[in-house]
Amino acid sequence: MAAFTAQDVKTLREKTGCGMMDCKKALTNADGDMDKAIDFLREQGLAKAAKKASRIAAEGVAYATTNADASVGVVIEVNAETDFVAKNDSFMDFVKACAQTVIEQNPADVDELLTLKAAGTEQTVAELLQEKIQTIGENIKIRRFERMEGACVAYVHAGGKSGVLVNFTTDIAVNDEFIAYGKDVAMQIAALNTPYLTEADVPAEVIEHEKEVMRQQVINEGKPEAIADKIVMGKIGKFYKENCLVDQEFVKDNKQTIKQYTNNTAKALGGSIEIAKFVRFEKGEGIEKRNDDFAAEVASMM
């Protein structure tokens, strides 16, 4: 009996973009272990480095905003049952009230946020949430948020599919030119799903794992083991350039990296800019939605 399900095949396919039969073979080889199956596909040259997060499936929005002088920012995710709700003005008013409450009152977590008086109302966030559930007719949940202090720029991508908040260390006033630069950086993070800021932020275990997979991939391609390590080092350099924000090519101008774009902007504005940190939330990240028809299709092949 297979050590995995039709849903596992579906999930692996979504994570890697590989064909159904390749995914089934990988899961069989890995005895149902999802991460090992991903590594198997990569070692065979069938899949690129997969971001090991479940498929985006929940509805609602990821939203990001700042206060008036861009000295405090928040990125927040609020989930609902259907994508229709994300276009509902009443739902978006609730999301914005939650974000403003986080900016003004700095709750430690969602549980504390629910107890606070919602910005611009006389109700607690929990009371306002229950009111929205009743009037909209769907279950609504505040899933997570992150708040930052200091120069911040917020960006909402594709109508709430993802929200990005970028925090900067700078001696430059956050004016229109600075915000335009900051939004370029945030858009890059949103579009490429950038996982790390710098090479130093990549965990050692991630690099070791990448090296192991890359080395096996090189050997499977028929390269001599004697030169495998040298090839792997070149591939690791490429990994950094693809996954570390400051080393990435700027999507609007691939002749410069994000670090170079940052330095050039700072020079033009007469000061210094350093990207301190960033957070990207994607709507429904890690939440699965059932797809019975697809699962049945896969099951019929097992």
Where are these regions (language model features)?
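N-terminal assembly/interaction segments in proteins that build large macromolecular machines
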Residues: 2-302
